Curated annotation (Swiss-Prot):
This is Threonine--tRNA ligase. Catalyzes the attachment of threonine to tRNA(Thr) in a two-step reaction: L-threonine is first activated by ATP to form Thr-AMP and then transferred to the acceptor end of tRNA(Thr). Also edits incorrectly charged L-seryl-tRNA(Thr). It comes from Borreliella burgdorferi (strain ATCC 35210 / DSM 4680 / CIP 102532 / B31) (Borrelia burgdorferi). NCBIfam families: thrS (TIGR00418). It is found in: Cytoplasm. GO terms for biological process: threonyl-tRNA aminoacylation. Zn(2+) binds at residues 278, 329, 455. Its cofactor is Zn(2+). SMART domains: tRNA_SAD (SM00863). Homodimer. Its main location: cytoplasm. Binds 1 zinc ion per subunit. Keywords: Aminoacyl-tRNA synthetase, ATP-binding, Cytoplasm, Ligase, Metal-binding, Nucleotide-binding, Protein biosynthesis, RNA-binding, tRNA-binding, Zinc.
Amino acid sequence: MSKDLDKEDILYKKRHSIAHVMAEAVLDLFPNTKIAIGPPIKDGFYYDFEFKKQITEDSLLDIENRMREILKTGSSFEKEIISVEQALEIFKDEPYKIDLIKNFDLQNEVSIYKSHNFVDLCRGPHVENMNKIDPKAFKLTSIAGAYWRGSEKNPMLTRIYGTLWNNEKELRSYLNLREEIKKRDHRKLGKELDLFSIHEEIGPGLVFFHPNGAKIRALIEDFWREEHSKNGYDILFTPHIGKSWLWQTSGHLDFYKDSMFEKIEMDKSDYYLKPMNCPFHIAIYNTGKHSYRDLPFRWAELGTVYRYEKIGALHGMMRARGFTQDDAHIICTHSQVLDEIKEVLRFAIYMWSKFGFSNPKAYLSTKPDKSVGNDSDWEMSLKVLEETLSDFEVPYEIDKGGGAFYGPKIDLKIVDSLEREWQMSTIQFDFNLPERFNMTYTAEDGKEKRPFMIHRALLGSIERFFGILVEHYGGAFPLWLSPVQVVIIPVNNIVEDYAIKVFNKFKNEGIRIKLDNSSSRMNAKIREYQAKKIPYMFIIGEREATEERISIRTRTNEQINGMKLDEALKFILFKIRDKEI
């Protein structure tokens, strides 16, 4: 239900207006508080404050109540255009507003909005008056810290988040979804299901996969390798570290150094942990001479990279400092570009489908003001990307001028079961690195030419994709991805021999199966394995043992009684081999 809103959308205006109402309520309840900025955002709004005494979430209800009192006045939101000098006078006691104003051209005018007893430096837009806002359709949701202007060098402010919708029903729907998102948080489920951990004392942003999580990751990676081999890719392995000349040549030290770990001095040379895999693949390409007959090369790697993310930006598996990228680079001729791009998109859509995702949306980024490469290559590559999206009927938006300086790209996004949009795949032309590393091939006319290079990732970071899967399925992974697929629960010792026979029969077929012959009560076992999200429980009693059958209980409490053993095996194997979602 969440989406980015246009500034002229009524909900955008309502959220902008309620942020002003919240600021007034805060100033009423906490005099001498300093105000910073308060924009509408996806799903709601926020406002940043500097409090004399830090508040807690216990204060949110009081602020909400005061906001409703202000809304009852029905006051108008009135825009005024004033000079910069007037603005400096009005906000003379507001240091953060003064900081904003001082960045304005002194010859220009600025706009302010007045509502009830509040004045704010603001471009708008807003609703006409407070009667347009349903007082039952908003809620303050959380408090967080935020540096002024996003810089750690500046003061830490208190950010109050809220959400607002058109009516109470929409609000309730959103809050219910928010609760479900909390329940499915991959950090919470990662602990409950023993999937992974992060140890701050060892290093923030570094992910440790436990046996259950490692099994799922191995299944993802095995499937990835198998499908890439089927689709004409060769698998590469490259080092985690490289000398500084490599990163200087690639341009990373000039343009990406802030996101790299500090250099490592060794053997009188400087080394860096790799933030990307591309230069290593180019190094392999440049080990020999290539003819047009050799192309295209499709080289793929599950390459672990390291990027310095600020502590505050880290978020479990979704934003880590060490992660494995499902990178590939396609090196081809001009005439091969269209077919290669189409094949990448087809492959991406297929891969997502096996994990339960469909109906992608694309964002096509075009040439920025500053760029490398010639105009004809840019025009050709953009045309190829647009044609490919149209052929596959993928809806897309154009991000004009939003491309990297070295080439246009497509970002492909999917929507999960919680209605959230995730960027999954990137298809990126690169007119920069082939030039920097002097990549060539011998063309049909015998001349040396520059190949086209296409970067692509289908799943992105394996860690991030893992986290998305955890939340998408709420930890209840499809059968083929579940670390334990079946648990056998014998009802008593009399049937233990048959239970062992069933266990061995399924295990020999490669099914990940567990036999629980502990003394715990059967109902307690069922509850335990349902909580662990095990897909199937085989309940074996004396009748099942006598007739060589099993009774099946699912993690969602469905039951299939008295299925023949061989039929049960076929049933499970089919679901696994078909990768049924």
